[in-house]
């Protein structure tokens, strides 16, 4: 079964491409397309290029001809798996590109101090993200950080996250301006892209942006006479979204059931209450203040304030007899059957901090963590419906990287990207008479809808882009290459702007239509098939995307206003413009666009429709610009390009 945005035949006029998109589902694998070859050596080269493009479309923000050629060359030399593993090692060895630093660089290049207040500086946060996604060398780290940001979600709707304020924290020091806090959170995710899950969970918990977003900041211990109890928000979400999910899972992704056939919850309301007691006493970092109610400081991890941390006595003290303890009241905290260590009296900051870390140890050790987290990572990086075998192989690496280490993110990312299932969405068949590589797609269980941001970044990166921005990145000397937050109005997705802690879309979302109720094969661990990215594809958003994409293809640039001036990113397609002078070169142009944008999945039917439509409208060499623009628009709007195999 194959979810496709079924495209009616394109109608091409002199400057307009109209493609009507209808959400639909086919029920079988289909021929994606063919790549002609002159000899066996070309067959090998073509296969390597397609495999390289397919891998890079998942591991980066989009392949380029240069990155395809580089990886394909190594595939020819040492084989697919070794070449890709080598590439991963090289990527994680690169210095991390910092969102915070790039944002500071852009605002400084614009002639302002990074800590200047009152200039709407939060807009630079988005500009920095796009510049890094489009140009950074450490593509894999940034792509994994993007995936992690959709699991450990914060959003700019958080209180003060867009403020231009900074404040003194004693000893002559000041906080960073509030708007940079989200950039530091994203950098933290990027650092842990090749780190350890348990350490990531700790840094997420102590980060002030997460503390503010999910109410752990200033969360106070209970006061029974006053009717006050700890806020349960972070306790609930760290379990539901950041670690174990709602229901118990087998390591191959299947949901466990009890004797009555019912799903087995991973936690209950009492578990939330118990864990909420742990996440008390958090305040923002201050050098000298003794107050629990210190103001925002998004540049340093939160601190523990022991006086407001649940000390296992505040539930037991008799309010009518201070100091008298009810012996039947709980004297400890128990999580998942594990009783946390006793707390000293008086309680110290160090002991309260240690209790938080002990609780995180308990959470991270749960059996549900590997399948829950690995499934989300696979969905964000590779495919919507990983098989049971795929899940088993990846969760095995999560549990033990081969050296006795649990939660090694480097090993997990390798297991995800090097798994044979990554390339099983396409079969590359050698055919003769004539000699060619025929690409056959396997259908829904091996695919996913490309999310809007990936469609934009992949498109731009493939077009040999140049920027006309008036200032340059000090690391490269090249102009900053940026989009702005305004693009959200065109594609319904924007970094740092998830509508809620549940991300842009749910992992178990099923779009209306044939997919609902369609039984998957036995290789799939769930009873249904899911397509998360379809949740942001509505009739309205699809229409906006068509209009915007067709316009970009027609003008061959993308431009948005920045905080200062505007940035135009131009497509360098001079080679293809020269080819487009002759209609006979249209197959070669489509071959290039197919490799760059579709990883070889552009069907022969789509190619034929595009060629027929273009040749019926234009024949002279002077119409080469029109031909190229129409070909580009038709490819980028095709269902073959929208669906990643």
Predicted regions span which residues?
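N-terminal secretory signal peptides that target proteins for export/translocation
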Residues: 1-11
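Cell-wall polysaccharide-cleaving catalytic domain and substrate-binding groove, primarily
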Residues: 46-98, 208-209, 216-223, 240, ...
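Active-site substrate-binding loop specific to GH73 endo-beta-N-acetylglucosaminidase modules
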Residues: 122-129, 162-415, 419-472, 642-645
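Bacterial N-terminal signal peptides
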Residues: 15-28
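Bacterial Sec-dependent N-terminal signal peptides
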Residues: 25-45
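N-terminal accessory alpha/beta regions
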Residues: 63-192, 290, 296-297, 304-306
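Substrate-binding/catalytic groove segments of enzymes
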Residues: 66, 158, 246-252, 286, ...
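Flexible, low-complexity segments enriched for small/polar residues
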Residues: 45-46, 53-60, 76-77, 113, ...
């Amino acid at each position: 079964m194959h979810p496709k945005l079924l495209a009616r035949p394109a109608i091409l006029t002199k400057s307009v491409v109209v493609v009507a998109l209808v959400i639909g589902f086919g029920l079988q694998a289909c021929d994606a397309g063919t790549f002609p070859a002159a000899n066996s050596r070309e067959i090998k080269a073509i296969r390597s290029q397609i495999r390289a493009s397919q891998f890079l479309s998942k591991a980066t923000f989009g392949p380029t001809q240069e990155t395809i050629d580089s990886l394909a060359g190594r595939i020819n030399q040492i084989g697919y798996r070794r070449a890709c593993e080598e590439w991963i090692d090289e990527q994680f060895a690169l210095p991390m590109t910092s969102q915070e630093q790039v944002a500071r660089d852009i605002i400084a290049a614009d002639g302002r101090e990074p800590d200047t207040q009152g200039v709407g500086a939060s807009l630079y946060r988005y500009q920095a993200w796009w510049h890094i996604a489009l140009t950074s060398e450490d593509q894999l780290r940034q792509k994994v950080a993007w995936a992690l940001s959709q699991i450990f979600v914060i959003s700019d709707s958080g209180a003060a996250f867009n403020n231009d304020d900074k404040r003194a924290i004693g000893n002559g020091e000041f906080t960073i301006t509030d708007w940079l806090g989200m950039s530091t959170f994203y950098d933290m995710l990027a650092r842990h892209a090749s780190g350890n899950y348990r350490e990531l969970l700790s840094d997420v918990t102590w980060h002030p942006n997460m503390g503010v977003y999910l109410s752990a900041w200033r969360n106070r211990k209970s006061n029974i006479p006053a009717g006050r109890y700890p806020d349960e928000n972070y306790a609930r979400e760290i379990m539901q979204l950041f670690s174990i999910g709602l229901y118990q899972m087998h390591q191959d992704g299947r949901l466990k059931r009890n004797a009555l056939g019912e799903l087995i919850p991973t936690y209950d309301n009492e578990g939330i209450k118990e864990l909420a007691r742990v996440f008390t006493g958090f305040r923002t970092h201050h050098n000298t203040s003794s107050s629990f109610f210190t103001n925002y400081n998004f540049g340093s991890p939160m601190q523990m304030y022991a006086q407001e941390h649940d000390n296992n006595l505040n539930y037991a003290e008799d309010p009518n007899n201070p100091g008298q303890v009810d012996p039947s009241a709980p004297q400890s905290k128990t999580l998942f059957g594990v009783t946390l260590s006793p707390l000293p009296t008086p309680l110290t900051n160090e002991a309260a901090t240690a209790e938080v870390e002990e609780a995180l140890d308990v959470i991270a050790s749960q059996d549900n963590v590997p399948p829950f987290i690995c499934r989300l990572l696979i969905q964000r990086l590779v495919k919507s419906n990983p098989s049971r075998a795929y899940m088993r192989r990846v969760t095995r690496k999560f549990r033990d990287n081969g050296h006795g280490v649990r939660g090694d993110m480097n090993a997990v990312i390798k297991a995800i990207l090097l798994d044979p299932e990554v390339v099983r969405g396409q079969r590359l068949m050698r055919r003769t008479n004539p000699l060619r590589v025929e690409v056959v797609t396997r259908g829904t269980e091996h695919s996913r809808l490309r999310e809007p941001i990936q469609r934009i970044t992949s498109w731009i990166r493939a077009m040999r882009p140049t920027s006309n921005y008036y200032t340059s990145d000090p690391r490269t000397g090249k102009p900053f290459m940026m989009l702005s937050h305004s693009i959200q109005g065109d594609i319904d997705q924007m970094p740092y702007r998830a509508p809620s802690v549940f991300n842009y879309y749910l992992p178990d979302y099923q779009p209306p239509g044939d997919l609902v109720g369609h039984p998957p094969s036995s290789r799939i661990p769930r009873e249904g098939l899911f397509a998360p990215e379809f949740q942001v594809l509505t009739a309205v958003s699809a229409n906006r995307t068509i209009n915007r994409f067709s316009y970009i293809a027609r003008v061959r640039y993308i431009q948005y206003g920045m905080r200062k001036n505007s940035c135009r990113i131009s497509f360098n397609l001079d080679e293809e413009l020269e080819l487009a002078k002759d209609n006979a070169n249209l197959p070669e142009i489509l071959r290039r666009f197919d490799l760059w944008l579709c990883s070889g999945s552009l069907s022969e039917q789509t190619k034929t429709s595009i060629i027929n439509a273009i040749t019926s409208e234009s024949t002279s060499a002077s119409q080469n610009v029109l031909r190229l623009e129409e070909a580009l628009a038709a490819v980028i709007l095709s269902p073959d390009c929208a669906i990643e195999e």
